[in-house]
Amino acid sequence: AYQPLGRNAPPEVKNTQWIRNGIDNFVLARLEAAGIDPSEEADRHTLIKRLFYDLIGLPPEPEQVDPFVDDRSPDAYEKLVNRLLASPRFGERWGRHWLDKARFADSDGYEKDNPRPDAWRWRDWVIDAVNRDMPFDEFTVRQLAGDLLPEAGPIDRLATAFHRQTLTNTEGGVDQEEFRVAAVKDRVDTTGAIWLGLTVGCAQCHSHKYDQITQREYYQLFAFFNNGDEATAEVPTSDEATARYEEAKKKHDAKSA
């Protein structure tokens, strides 16, 4: 698995008219090897539904379909793609994937599962980062150590709430140190999984059987996260964002009452 990445030249294909970019070469080469012809190009009604579901996770409104179907300009498809990429819904759709991997939730978990009223602030930071097309290296640094950046501001510290997405036990009488250590372990495991793509957690009890991670290395990483404190910081947000949250919360509470 630990092989350096190489740059492979796109394979040659017979049906060169079908090719629009280098990725198509790889797809078509496999299809031709299997004796399979590519599917016919989808009609406009199918295309707009696919684009909406893929890019923003929502179906198109009826009044959005006809203008695209009737638009016969050669760049109609590209214009629709750009419009959906510029939509705030794009960040909500694709930021959801990162939020899931980072174990985001609006409540603490465990038996009490108390609500986290300010959890949405980090969620919205992720969504905004996706919508602004933040470079992945910057996206990484700000979440892992945004508070250590030169002249770090409140938003930089907010990004590090990635580390606060662990389960929190607020039940009375529990051993807080036990659950603090469990939270640190969760940070190690999650960081290894989503940034390294490795099951780092296997090395908690023994050196990894398959990946090149020793038990000693696991606890070296554990020691790094064990130095952090779960400090509470006031993070200012715009009045507009706060108003949107309060309005959405009222609607949610009314429906679930």
Where are the language model's segments positioned?
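Short, structured secondary-structure elements
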Residues: A1-E246
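Long, charged, low-complexity terminal extensions
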Residues: A248-A257
